[in-house]
């Protein structure tokens, strides 16, 4: 083997190793706890809301329109209540985005999901009164979608994409590949995902994640 071939093989091996490491690092950066925030409410309970494993996969828009941004959202939101009366806690857990756009003429957002993609996390169905060892979750309905007009830009708008009723001292919700689009936006679009816990008493706490660029 000539010296030139040995050098060429060494360069290709180094390039492949660096590329593989880059892909592994990018995937690991979004695993685990992303962000959290706590609040002591009016009843001296500590309300904590968290975002886990957040990943927004921006894809080329199917309509091939330069003013459309399309993505799929996966992740989990969890809440913890500690203090007096935590077992009797009732409220709502919301997920959504802050959407920033530099210029637009009538921006619209669409977001949709199918019920098997929304899972109640940390729920125990093996104990009474359920006593179930396994569960199959068919679609409760074909899907749910929201549409909103964000108006003319530039601007920052906040949209709650879905919410679930929760009770007890802890719980969560998981979403996998929920579909979202923004139309009518010129330039880059930034999405900042959030999770919000709202108690039945009106107290609320919101945690915001890092912005995701949907160029």
UniProtKB/Swiss-Prot annotation:
Compartment list: Cell outer membrane; Secreted, Cell wall
GO cellular component, one term: pore complex
Pfam families: MspA
GO molecular function (one): porin activity
Signal sequence region: 1-31
Single GO biological process annotation from the record: monoatomic ion transport
Induction of synthesis: Not expressed in wild-type cells, it is induced in an mspA deletion mutant.
Gene deletion effect: Single deletion is viable, and shows no effects on glucose uptake.
Predominant cellular place of this UniProt entry's protein: membrane
Keywords from the named record: Cell outer membrane, Cell wall, Ion transport, Membrane, Porin, Secreted, Signal, Transmembrane, Transmembrane beta strand, Transport
InterPro entries linked to this entry: Leukocidin/porin_MspA_sf (IPR036435), Porin_fam_mycobact-type (IPR015286)
Lineage top rank: taxon: Bacteria
Its biological purpose: A backup porin induced when MspA, the major porin, is deleted. Probably forms a water-filled channel which favors the permeation of cations. There are about 2400 porins in wild-type, 800 in an mspA deletion and 150 in a double mspA-mspC deletion. A triple mspA-mspC-mspD deletion mutant has low but detectable channel activity. Different conductance values with maxima at 2.3 and 4.6 nanosiemens might be caused by a simultaneous reconstitution of MspB channels into the membrane or by the existence of different MspB conformations.
Protein family (similarity comment): Belongs to the mycobacterial porin (TC 1.B.24) family.
Subunit field text: Octamers. Probably forms a goblet with the wide end on the exterior of the outer membrane and a central channel. It is not known if mixed oligomers of MspB with other Msp subunits form in vivo.
Protein name according to UniProt: Porin MspB
Organism listed in the record: Mycolicibacterium smegmatis (strain ATCC 700084 / mc(2)155)
Taxon lineage: Bacteria, Bacillati, Actinomycetota, Actinomycetes, Mycobacteriales
Underlying gene: mspB
